[in-house]
Structures are given as structure tokens and as C-alpha cells.
């Protein structure tokens, strides 16, 4: 589908193209070639292999903000659950790195457990519920491995929903027994049976920033 739309852009020759997601790795050359003829900007995370304009998040800072919030609440032993931390998805790694840096500065980096899904998952076409399943399954594994964590962080809200449901099934109270945090502030973060602590990254401001690109 993505390839079809890119070829359509060649034919339509619009004044500009806004990519609201990261281009698939197999089409990056095509996107870059297209950008030589038509202005292209990505409103997402810049890929170092792709030479086009981008409006992106500082994911390292985002990770630090998440960690700082938990530290201020008194959490010391925490877990961080993420999708595969691959070179193709560097924004994931940067978010985790920022989180770890904040705990390192507090002198307790060794108290953070990082659980990331297998890299093979990134080779398949993602299912709509794949991130939810990552949060759910890795939380179940985590609960078998350790009993003394006080907070679990999901790299994004969908993972956090999986975390919440796994804890609910294990009869662990949130936030009474374990705190849960996500990131993205999706609509469902306010609709879940337990309102999710999350971080807003103001998508509308990204769009405004794009209009200022030259």
C-alpha cells in the first residue's frame, strides 16, 4: 500500500508531501528519490539513513522525564517494557537510554529491569494488537522473575494497556501495589478501567512546526 501511494505521488506531482509516520525501510530509497523532485517532510522520528526534513521528538528527553517522575514519587526498583530495540527503530532505544541515564544519575541504574521483545518481531508485518501483546506477555514473564518492583513502564500506551491487564489478571492493584506508566497520551489512556499515567507529546505542535519549515 505504501509503495502504491508513493508511485501515485510521482504521477500527481503535489506541491509537497507530509509523511506522518516513518517510511518503511524497504521504501526509503524511493522516498529520498521523490524528495529530490517534491518537498518531503516527516512528522515522526528522523532516520539517520534518510536525508529528508523531519519534525521529531527528543526521545531521550522523553525517557528522562518518565524516569524523573517515578524517582520523584519514590520508586527505586522499576521495570521498562519495550518492543524490539532494533537499529531500524532508534527512537525506541533513545527513549530507553534517556530513562536509564536519569536512574544512573540517581545512582541506581542497576535497579532498572529492561525487558524488550525479540528482534524477530520487527521482521514480520505488525498486527494491530502486537504492542498490547508485548506488554501483556512480558509483564507475565516479569512477575515470574521478580516480586519487588514498584513500577512498570511501557514504551508507549499500547504496551502499558497490556501491562495493566496482566497485572489485573494477577490480582495486583494499580497503583496500590505497582504503578504503571505509558507514553503518548492516546484517547484510550483516559478510557481504560484504570486511568493511565502517560506523557503528552502534543502532535498538533508537530504539525505547526512543519509549517515553519523552509
Where are these regions (language model features)?
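Bacterial carbohydrate/catabolite-sensing allosteric modules
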Residues: 3-13, 28, 35-42, 46-214
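Structural motif
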Residues: 20-23, 83-84
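Beta-alpha junction/loop-to-helix N-cap segments that form part of ligand/metal-binding clefts
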Residues: 22-25, 34
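Core AdoMet radical
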Residues: 15-17
Amino acid at each position: 500500500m505504501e509503495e502504491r501511494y508513493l508511485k501515485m505521488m510521482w504521477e500527481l506531482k503535489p506541491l509537497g508531501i507530509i509523511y506522518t509516520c516513518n517510511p518503511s525501510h524497504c521504501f526509503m530509497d524511493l522516498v529520498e528519490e521523490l524528495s529530490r523532485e517534491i518537498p518531503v517532510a516527516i512528522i515522526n522520528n528522523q532516520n539517520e539513513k534518510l536525508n529528508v526534513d523531519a519534525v521529531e521528538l527528543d526521545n531521550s528527553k522523553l525517557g528522562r522525564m518518565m524516569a524523573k517522575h517515578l524517582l520523584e514519587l519514590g520508586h527505586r526498583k522499576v521495570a521498562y517494557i519495550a518492543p524490539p530495540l532494533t537499529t531500524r527503530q532508534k527512537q525506541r532505544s533513545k527513549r530507553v537510554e534517556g530513562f536509564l541515564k536519569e536512574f544512573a544519575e540517581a545512582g541506581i541504574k542497576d535497579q532498572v529491569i529492561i525487558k524488550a521483545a525479540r528482534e524477530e518481531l520487527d521482521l514480520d508485518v505488525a498486527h494491530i494488537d502486537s504492542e498490547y501483546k508485548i506488554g501483556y506477555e512480558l509483564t507475565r514473564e516479569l512477575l515470574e522473575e521478580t516480586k519487588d518492583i514498584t513500577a512498570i513502564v511501557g514504551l508507549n500506551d499500547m504496551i502499558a494497556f497490556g501491562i495493566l491487564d496482566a497485572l489485573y489478571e494477577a490480582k495486583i492493584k494499580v497503583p496500590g501495589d505497582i504503578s504503571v506508566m505509558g507514553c503518548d497520551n492516546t484517547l484510550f489512556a483516559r478510557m481504560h478501567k484504570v486511568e493511565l499515567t502517560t506523557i503528552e507529546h502534543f502532535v498538533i505542535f508537530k504539525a505547526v512546526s512543519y509549517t515553519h519549515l523552509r
